[in-house]
């Protein structure tokens, strides 16, 4: 939908990717309505198979993506591939609780949310395991975001 596009400074050149044409159209409408001249493109593309050359970007930002793609590791591999050495990968995602009543609620919701393509029980270990197996990725920040800590910000640097 391009919801995050206006949050970047106008000096930041942006390319947006989505597999959904209706979501891309909403982003195009937002770009036009808010005169976001720094958005260089909005492209229909699969996050697990990006058509960009290796090391194309200084930073890849993937908000609310990993819980909706079929293969989060393939998506993370693609993000790492298109980011230049020294560049960053920035994720914002809901990370499920690992224990307690919230974990039980998320597991229940997960059984019903799967048809929507969303996994409320998405565990951190999917990202953590990926980072551990990648010698070229370093986790530089991980923190819960307000409100209520429902989302987690993770920043990684590609060596």
Model feature map: region roles:
Residues 59-71:
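A short SAM/SAH-binding and catalytic strip from SAM-dependent methyltransferases
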Residues 45-59:
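A short acidic, Gly/Pro-enriched loop at the edge of an enzyme's catalytic core
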Residues 92-152:
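C-terminal alpha-helical "lid/dimerization" subdomain adjacent to the S-adenosyl-L-methionine
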């Amino acid at each position: 939908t391009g919801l995050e596009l206006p949050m970047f400074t106008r000096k930041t050149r942006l390319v947006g990717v989505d597999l959904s044409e209706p979501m891309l159209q909403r982003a195009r409408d937002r770009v036009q309505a808010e005169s976001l001249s720094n958005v260089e493109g909005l492209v229909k593309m699969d996050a697990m198979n990006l058509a960009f050359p290796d090391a194309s970007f200084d930073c890849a930002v993937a908000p609310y993506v990993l819980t909706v793609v079929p293969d989060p590791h393939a998506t993370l591999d693609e993000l790492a591939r298109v980011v230049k050495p020294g560049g960053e990968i920035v994720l914002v995602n809901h990370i499920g609780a690992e224990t307690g009543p919230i974990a039980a609620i998320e597991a229940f919701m997960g059984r019903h949310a799967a048809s929507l393509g969303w996994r409320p029980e998405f565990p951190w270990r999917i990202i953590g395991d990926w980072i551990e197996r990648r010698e070229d990725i370093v986790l530089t920040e991980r923190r819960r975001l307000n409100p209520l800590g429902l989302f987690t910000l993770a920043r990684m640097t590609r060596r």
